[in-house]
Amino acid sequence: GNSVSDDRAQAYASLSSMTSLEQDEAQEYKQRLTTAPDSAAIKSILAEAKTTNEQNRADADAAAAKKAADDKIAKKTEAALSGVTLVGLSDECKGITLTLKADKTWDIEINRTPNNCIGEPKGKNWKIVVNDQHEGKPVLRFSEDAIAYEVTLNGDGTVSLENSGVYKFTISK
């Protein structure tokens, strides 16, 4: 068979082709290959590196797929709310009208006191994001506002915005 140094050289080459290894992981495997006493140890380290590389690739693929799915939900929700006026429907929101303009700016009219519905947003733009914090649900955010509203398109021409309460609005064009 091959000499240990041949096996080691082949292992280095194989290791350098594993593109899904983190830099520190590759470094660690390289170090372990350098000090491996025999061909069996070299093979074992290489097998471990391959497993890590494949796991990293699978994780990266899953993350990319999740991001694509999240983006799709965000885009669909954004399309449903872009250029519409939300008219307060639930009791605490009657008298409140929020317009989400197609250019991503907004207007709000608050004709009620006290206001226990959504408050005056901060910042001049709105957007829909989907992230892990809200378990993959679409969220309405305003550019300078810490408050996020989980969005549920109810399928009956209404939308619910959820923060400390669930605020229901009728969608009108």
Language-model-detected regions and their locations in the chain:
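Amphipathic alpha-helical assembly segments used for oligomerization, scaffolding, or translocation
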Residues: 1-75
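Acidic, low-complexity intrinsically disordered regions
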Residues: 153-154
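N-terminal helix-cap/turn-to-beta initiation motif at the start of protein domains
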Residues: 69-87, 97-103
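Short, low-complexity, Pro/Ser/Thr/Gly-rich segments in the mature regions of secreted, periplasmic
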Residues: 163-173
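N-terminal glycine/threonine-rich, aromatic-flanked beta-hairpin/loop signature
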Residues: 91-149, 160-165
